[in-house]
Amino acid sequence: MAVTRAKIALDAMGGDYAPEEIVIGAIRASQELDVDIFLVGDRQAIEDCLNRHPHQGINLTIVDAEGVVEMEEDAVVVRRKPKASINVAMNLVKEKQADAVVSAGHSGAAMAAALLRLGRLKGIDRPAIGTLFPTMVPGKSVIVLDVGANVDCKPKYLEQFALMGTVYSQYVLGVDSPKVGLLNIGEESNKGNTLALQTHELLQSNPEIPFVGNAEGRDVLSGNFDVIVCDGFVGNIVLKFAEAVGEILLSIVKEELPRGWRGKLGAIILAPNLKRIKQRVDHAEHGGALLFGVDGVCVISHGSSRSGSIFNAIRLAKEAIDNQVSVRINSSTSLLMERQKTEELQNI
């Protein structure tokens, strides 16, 4: 892994708590991570936030932008707002002034801006949003993609998702031989709809993908898989359900544990354990999701992100930069394209 001083273009105006929480997260990241940060947005609003929080001796640069794509607006608005913060941030990456974009704003707008400004990697038909899920194995995560970028998919899209997930698992998560699974309603190869059946065949025949078979819903958090692929419709439902389960679990613990003096004593004794539980199940700990398949690093954070989540999103972006995820995916998909061309020539 080549560790570099990463330059992050941070959409300071994106999110429910922008710019305050975004700026606080940026300050912490600048202090604790080896990064330089461009705060993109309304200069006066950003400066007001900086004045309220100590930030001496750290490298934060404000880049002017005009306006923001609001959550209720359609993603295509990015075309009509070229000076919006998300577009300006993407341009910094396009012009090689920054290495990655991080945004907690409109996720559809972030994806649209990435496609417009950065473009797709060769061999990628559709970008995918990939996010890390905790598993029952301590310290192990599983990357699931797509979790919302493409509600309708072709088998070849899922094959590309599997390649991108494999690269991430190998070079960022450090898994030598990742186990790739296809999310389905059963383990058997003859289970599922047309998309699942055709995708299973593609994944099984691709030597670049360490495919081990179908993964059922219960397998997502089991730790038996390192990469799980699905279409964005199913993936987004899985993501939102998992987030809700995590929130409910934490809520139940907070509600039940302090009851009575024994509970209060137990809460004090178990405080370190409870903190670790929160770190494993709280989606804010991962910071966001990577947009795979675009020509650059892009992290999309939850709209409700607070400063801690923004910090983690910046860390996620830096890991992708240090491990050259985009470059490695490009190499992997180039091999896929060459194999497909060879097969086409053989079939003539």
From Swiss-Prot:
Protein name, as recorded: Phosphate acyltransferase
Subunit structure: Homodimer. Probably interacts with PlsY.
Family membership: Belongs to the PlsX family.
EC number: 2.3.1.274
Pathway the protein acts in: Lipid metabolism; phospholipid metabolism
Places the protein is found: Cytoplasm
Alphabetical list of Gene3D superfamilies matching this protein: Isopropylmalate Dehydrogenase
Chain's role: Catalyzes the reversible formation of acyl-phosphate (acyl-PO(4)) from acyl-[acyl-carrier-protein] (acyl-ACP). This enzyme utilizes acyl-ACP as fatty acyl donor, but not acyl-CoA.
Any one GO CC term of the record: cytoplasm
Top-rank taxon: Bacteria
Reaction catalyzed: a fatty acyl-[ACP] + phosphate = an acyl phosphate + holo-[ACP]
Matches recorded under InterPro entries: FA_synthesis, Phospholipid_synth_PlsX-like
Molecular function terms, GO-annotated: phosphate:acyl-[acyl carrier protein] acyltransferase activity
One GO biological process term: fatty acid biosynthetic process
Keyword Kinase: no
